Amino acid sequence: MSYEKKAVHFGGGNIGRGFVAEFLHNSGYEVVFVDVMDSIIESLQKTKTYTVTEIGDDGERKFTIDHYRAINSKHEMDKVVQEIASADVVTCAVGPNILKFVAEPVAKAIEARTLDYPIAVIACENAINATTTWRGFIESKLSEETKKNIDSKARFANSAIDRIVPQQPPNGGLDVVIEKFHEWCVEQKPFENGGKKPDVKGIHYVDDLEPYIERKLFTVNTSHATAAYYGHQNKVQYIHEVLHDKKLHDTVRDAVKETAHLIVTKHGVETAEQDAYVEEIIKRISNPVLKDNVERVGRAPLRKLSRKERFIGPAAQLAERGEKVDALLGAVEQAYRFQNVEGDEESVELAKILKENSAEEVVTKVNGIEKGQPLFDRLVAIVKKVQGGS
């Protein structure tokens, strides 16, 4: 395979190496990894190949990833800008909170770009409209002239990604173990009228991304996190063990029954189709082969409890429609109890916020719900319960 196309990817972590780079590599792209972690960049620079192992019920398959380079943006920002300026695609998998920190090099590269077609900019994050968010940070650093002609320089497309990367084996190095199932949906409208749609095997281009994003976030992420937080409270180690407990299994299913009702009524998805999707997701996260650690899945509770995320996002919309949200709020309570977990800074910060603020302040600060909104009083009651230790 010839590797004449080039993609720059921010984030040398497991999703970057094991999902995004795998797809790009298998579609003939040379991948340039960008990260600030010395250890990851040094490993990528010293190692010419790494292996992605896809696991599933029917066994495993392995891919060798090569034709990549790596740059440390902490030390060689000018080089990063040059690479992006001459790339076909720039992607990221850094976490939604880091998008603002990877905006400046993209902005500088867009200013410097001389190719006669626009670069494709695609954020691969577990967040709604992450590329739009990234674009806002990028455009804040562009000249007015470039902003006026942005379509000739860059096209920004939101995406929805779905693939579970479980806890990795110790001493695995750069190799990544990942589930076989994958979904990467990208909106295609931004590439109309002169854009260059990335030719990546496995990307599903769609006209309207919102149903795909919400279906994924409010089913996969909601069920996964619900299992994690209930599992943590019940001192269960792995997600599949949570799902093999009938009571906990039913609790997780109840949460995604509520979100399924939203997906069906809001987006016009057939009930049978959404039910089948829910079944597929429950089956996936119940897979013992993944050995998915409860604390890994539960980490970053502040983000997961925020306004547009997997619990409050669907619960707020359902509450505004006068629909049932009991199971989702049960999961919210368990998420609030995910405090002071070793290795997770947000769980420590959550404990601090709960200690230093009133319940009303916590709900506004953490959940983004204001007094007078349908969920407010019920969330306040949950926080008071957690603060009271009951």
UniProtKB/Swiss-Prot annotation:
It comes from the Eukaryota. It is an enzyme of class 1 (oxidoreductase). The keyword Oxidoreductase applies. GO terms for biological process: mannitol catabolic process. One of its GO terms (cellular component) is cytosol. One of its GO terms (molecular function) is mannitol-1-phosphate 5-dehydrogenase activity. The active site is at K216. InterPro entries: 6-PGluconate_DH-like_C_sf (IPR008927), 6PGD_dom2 (IPR013328), Mannitol_1_phos_5_DH (IPR023028), Mannitol_DH (IPR000669), Mannitol_DH_C (IPR013118), Mannitol_DH_N (IPR013131), NAD(P)-bd_dom_sf (IPR036291). Pfam families: Mannitol_dh, Mannitol_dh_C. Transmembrane segments: none annotated. Keywords: NAD, Oxidoreductase. The keyword Oxidoreductase applies. Its EC number is 1.1.1.17. Monomer. Catalyzes the NAD(H)-dependent interconversion of D-fructose 6-phosphate and D-mannitol 1-phosphate in the mannitol metabolic pathway. Has a strong preference for NADH over NADPH. PANTHER family: ALTRONATE OXIDOREDUCTASE-RELATED, MANNITOL-1-PHOSPHATE 5-DEHYDROGENASE. This is Mannitol-1-phosphate 5-dehydrogenase. It comes from Alternaria alternata. The lineage of its organism: Eukaryota, Fungi, Dikarya, Ascomycota, Pezizomycotina.
